[in-house]
Amino acid sequence: MTSTQSRTGRLEIRSIDYVPLSERHGKVWHLGPLWFMSNAQIATLAVGLISISEGASLFWSVLAIVVGVLVGTLFMAFHSAQGPQLGLPQMIQSRPQFGYIGALLVWLFAYVQYAGFNVFNTILGGEAMSTTAHGPVKLWVVILTVVALVVALIGYDLIHKAEQWLTYLMIVIFGIFTITLFFIHYPAGTFDIGTFKASAFLGQFGVVAGYQISWAIYVSDYSRYMPPDVTVRKTFYWTYWGSAIGGGWMMIVGAVLAAWAGKNFDGTGIGELNQVGDHVFTGFGAIVLILATLGLVSVTALNMYGGSLTLISAVDSFRKVRPTLGLRVVTVGFTALLSLVGALAATKNFLGNFNNFLLLVLYLFIPWTAVNLVDYYIVRRGHYAIAEIFNPHGMYGRWGWRGILAYLIGFAAMIPFFDVGTLYEGPAARALGGADISFFVGLPVAGVLYYVFTRSVDVAAETRVAEAEAAELEEAAQRHQ
């Protein structure tokens, strides 16, 4: 193997460029710990707090979480399978659908997500560390950002290795914590089924599904170095169950903690984690918080890493760039700085802002995931001319009207069904009593339209181009060491 990053500790060089076969490495099972631990952190726990904090029963909240996780994780897992087959990071794969310039539409939204999540992540991490190790929250925000920056700069191999070790620790420590939940006293009526409220159920479902779908823009970034002979099925399963188990576990624990705290709920779950943990022994709550914060640091590094790839893709759309280590350092650093400024300037209403942000992510990426997956699995069936993706005048064009139009129409169809708390309630959502079913509208509209629009695409001709350019692509990629 002649990998540009053959062992943990060396700075990764590659970014948006194709990973040649000579540099492919890793086992498909590595995806399980990575996506388990990416979800097993405090921000995920906060997703499960939302409907409980609005008065829903624990039973219906947990059911909404389970359904939302099982549905939302499907999409991100299907995206993950693209990485080993194409050898490309996730968002650059949007060019065949949206065009060389047109893909900027979704890259802008993706970058907002990366930076936005890091604002929430570092605030939560800062509050958790301030609770356990004391000191100003903002100081801890800076420290956690710097640690995540170092991990992101070293890159792919360190991220995988760190997530594996953290997974082992999390299963043990959080397993003990979860068992403790069965032995604490809950308010009367906590486990009653309660009245089903469609708006609360769909609201929790939508936020959970949106959170899981939001990983779709990451997943190929962390599978693209794997050999192409790992099967799509295995890539899907390791990604799906790693993410679903980690995410579902944390969200359900969040809902249980909110139900246990009742009116004394602190708004983030940090205080409840600490208090319940101390039922094991004094100080165990601090151990749980520190470990959960390390999970936040790891996912913050993922956001910096993905944000860097998205920035480089955007720059490449206007001016052809040669991916280098220096370019990675600058773009990772800029992404870290941007989210740090946002975290230091953020307001106090964490849970309300986080809920609205998750809904925004869901709205923006439902049409994209439909377009991208229909293109990969149904239209082009995984056959792409990789070199043409980096050709500003190539066969995929500068503006992919099919993808752009399907996306915009799909998004527009969702607007009447939006329900974003006090910010906006669409007429259809209002007629449904506040139930937000935009997920079930945007996905089929965008997907079906894109399929119809692409009926005229000559996929056979594109495949011939891909086969003709394959050898040259490998040689060019190997020269970039």
Language model: regions and residue ranges:
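Membrane-interface "cap" regions at the ends of multi-pass membrane proteins
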Residues: 1-58, 201-206, 224-234, 457-481
